[in-house]
């Protein structure tokens, strides 16, 4: 249903992703797109916020990843300008490739030079006021709600750019649609999320502090699963 609603809105997405000066409209369009998809699929959602979050300032938003519902849900419960970072294979996705060819940043982890360029592009976007959304596991969990080992990229980016990290726990998406839903099926229901308070990184710099930050985020996300 999310794919169907995407094609309904494709002309608008195409127009607003053609020029960087129009990117600030994309987040609102994504929210409308995902809300339509949820209505068509008989999904609703509930998000609890630990504190009021100022989404007008750039941050790095991280979440556990268990379902194809995660990305559309995150688009509906946050605001402000943002972009995603994801594996280069998403360029082959018929729905997502439009975004990863324009506003979002694909990363080829098998190519160090390409990975470096992707990280520099993300840093540029953050300095322009765009938050970054990524899944620190780098892939979907194979045994939800358990999380896999985190990649260091998100936390190094946060320390390098001195922006806070906003952890979001998706509590039950995998129960409604595990993975893509093709193998185990899917069912309508209420998706639930918990938006934790932002974690500051401006005073961090050493490798030890970076490792501790990763552990802190892991435990923060895990605390609500």
Model-derived regions: residue spans:
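A short, well-structured juxtamembrane/interface segment
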Residues: 35-59
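Membrane-interfacial terminal anchoring regions of lipid-handling membrane enzymes
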Residues: 1-18, 24-28, 51-54, 124, ...
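Short acidic-hydrophobic, aromatic-tinged amphipathic segments that line or gate anion-handling sites
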Residues: 47, 105-108, 201
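Catalytic core of membrane glycerolipid acyltransferases/transacylases, capturing the structured
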Residues: 10-20, 24-28, 40, 55-112
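Short gly/ser/thr-rich secondary-structure transition/capping motifs
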Residues: 40-48, 115-116, 175-178
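Generic preference for hydrophobic
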Residues: 47, 61, 84, 134, ...
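Non-catalytic C-terminal accessory region of glycerolipid acyltransferases
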Residues: 118-225
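A membrane-cytosol interface segment of integral membrane proteins
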Residues: 105-125
């Amino acid at each position: 249903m999310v794919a169907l609603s995407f094609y309904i809105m494709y002309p608008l997405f195409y127009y607003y992703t053609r020029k960087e000066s129009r990117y600030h409209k994309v987040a609102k369009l994504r929210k409308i797109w995902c809300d339509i998809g949820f209505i068509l699929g008989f999904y609703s959602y509930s998000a609890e916020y630990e504190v009021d979050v100022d989404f007008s300032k750039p941050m790095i938003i991280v979440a556990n990843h268990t379902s194809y519902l995660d990305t559309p849900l995150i688009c509906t419960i946050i605001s402000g300008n943002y972009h995603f970072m994801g594996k280069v294979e998403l360029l082959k996705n018929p729905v997502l490739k439009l975004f990863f060819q324009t506003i979002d940043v694909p990363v080829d982890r098998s190519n160090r030079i390409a990975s470096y360029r992707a990280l520099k592009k993300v840093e540029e976007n953050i300095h322009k006021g765009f938050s970054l959304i990524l899944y620190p596991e780098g892939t979907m969990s194979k045994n939800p709600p358990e999380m896999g080992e985190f990649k260091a990229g998100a936390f190094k980016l946060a320390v390098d750019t001195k922006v806070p990290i906003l952890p979001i726990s998706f509590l039950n998406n995998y129960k409604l649609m595990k993975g893509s839903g093709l193998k185990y099926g899917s069912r309508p229901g209420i998706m639930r999320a918990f938006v934790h308070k932002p974690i500051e990184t401006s005073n961090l710099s050493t490798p030890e502090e970076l490792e501790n930050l990763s552990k802190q985020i892991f435990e923060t996300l895990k605390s609500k699963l």
